[in-house]
Amino acid sequence: MVLVKAGALVDVVAGTVKKGQAILIENGVIKEVGPNLVAPAGTRIVDLSAKTVLPGLIDVHTHITSQPEDYYADRFRRSPIDIAVIAHVYAKRTLEAGFTTLRVVGADEYIDVALRNAIDKGKIPGPRLKVAGLAIGSTGGHADFTGFSPYLRFELFSGVADGVDAVRKLVRQNVKFGADVIKMIASAGVLSEEESVGAPQYSFEEMKAICDEAAMWGRKVAAHAHGTEAIKRAVAAGVASVEHGSLIDEEGIRMMKERGTYLVADVYNDDWILAEFAKMGYPEKILEKERKIGLLQRENFQKAVKAGVKQAYGTDAGVYPHGMNGKQFAHMVRWGMTPLQAIQSATVNAADLLGWTMVGAIAPGKYADLVAVDGDPLKDVTLLEKIPFVMKGGEVVVSR
């Protein structure tokens, strides 16, 4: 058994901070939480009495198997095998940053499934993963390889499907090969070469077919959706979360609030993209889309927060280097959240979106996934950018 002594503990469910708490852990699961716990003989003590302890953090929008280096080389010289042999490094780096659970929303060749399985079996270190396999998108859309010669073929990596029957089949294929969640491309994107970032890329009927098929297999759907109409189609079709949500309007906000749909807004990575992507050879068309949409996304995120739309923490990690996931907390606070709300988005809210009752809070029956910081993150949320203590399943990952 393990007893963790916490100087302060953030109860993300109650929204309070409790002083002088202890956490008793057995077989990687929290057994008891409270003051003055008596540890059985032989219990290992982890003294965090000078720190504030929080649940392990959750990022629900990551691409843990990739990280951009060069726009064209990434497409023409990097194979799925290259990606597979480096993905475990990104996973370890993210875990050490305090993110003990991730949702992976799209990966080539089901590499995310293999990574999840290896982590679950204890073969490599990494966060707990919920994975999507291939992102499902339309021909010529954000999930397709656009902007290249028609003589180049990318079918090997493709999640492209058109029409109700084809998208249903691809949902089934993803489930067959191990997907925990379904990722749907509802609108055009920023980091691809379509013309309009807001344009819908599936009809309502196709979106509804994806959501219905996923539900039949017990899977939730995450919708990549920047554009106003695409967001509303996706919400009406029954998605669990809208990813990005950059151009959401008042009607879309109302629909999401009424249906309890989560917004997953990656409000940090605009800074990184504009600072670094030109150096990596990204086309001007892509950079111009980012310049136009970054501020709009943050302003609309602020409106959604104010309106009470459910928020879950998702950063699009893999667009920027893995392990920097904590950078987004400060941006969320800058654009309308309290520090507590930002922390809840990365703990209890994210767990609710995932449908994973074993993560997201410090309570009996949950995995002993903990992080600790020096100071009070409810006063200075930037403390979560460099976390000195990480525990996953009762095992210390980082202590510095």
Region locations from a protein language model:
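Histidine/acidic-residue-rich catalytic or RNA/ligand-binding cores of hydrolases
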Residues: 69-72, 192-194, 231-237, 267-282, ...
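Alpha-helix-loop-beta-strand connector modules within alpha/beta enzyme cores
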Residues: 117-135, 197-223, 260, 264-267
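Histidine-rich, glycine-flanked metal-binding segment
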Residues: 3, 9, 14-54
